[in-house]
Amino acid sequence: ELLQFLFDGGCELKNYLCASELGYVMQRELEPYGRRYEEALAMDFMEARTVTEPSAPEVETAGKGDLDEIFACAQRFVADCGLLDKPEKEPFRKVLDSFRILRADGKIVSMARIAPATQDDLRLVLVYTRDEYRGRGYARKVVNSAKNEILAAGKRVTLNVDRKKPVSYHLYLSLGFERMFSQGEFRRVDNRPGS
């Protein structure tokens, strides 16, 4: 009844983010209305509450001179993940000190941002390592150091991990993260004739 009311009122449901189980139910319920959706991003919400290894001293807080490089890495992250959001540079300037970075060969090779979440949690977002530096332990050092910093502040650490990226998933599990629930971003599939 709610869906009929919304659609009769001219509302549209472009995309939705929810627990995967609910998303699949919504897929079935929306089909009779001629609206098809598919799960474009399949993620697990994870949480960590304990220190599992010491922080890496070479992980540092980003500074003003890192803006261009962080923004370039963020753009690659968004493209790699298939996200629809297109980052804009200026907002990054305001949150530079929330990025933890690791340098090698004179450039940032791995990064993560500590972002607000709830009163009890902080989230790790924009966890990214340049392609040519993957598999060398850089992401582990950045994620672990940021995680330890959050825990030292008396907060829980949360993040989302793409279920299609087993290397990242294994990294987070090895650092003490536990899966709490699955969620997905469901995107509308245009099924009109000629599309």
Where would I find each of the regions flagged by the language model?
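Conserved acetyl-CoA-binding loop-helix of GNAT-fold acetyltransferases
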Residues: 1-5, 129, 135-152, 169-174
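A short, aromatic/hydrophobic, helix- or strand-capping loop or linear motif
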Residues: 17, 82-90
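Conserved active-site alpha-helix within GNAT-family acetyltransferase domains
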Residues: 21-38, 140, 163-181
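Conserved beta-strand-loop-alpha-helix junction that forms the acyl-donor binding cleft
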Residues: 17-23, 158-169, 185-194
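A conserved beta-strand-loop-helix scaffold within acyl/acetyltransferase catalytic domains
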Residues: 87-105, 109-128
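Acyl-donor-binding surface of acyltransferase catalytic domains
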Residues: 1-56, 186
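Recognition helices and adjacent regulatory flanks at domain boundaries
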Residues: 101-104, 115-117, 136-149, 160-162, ...
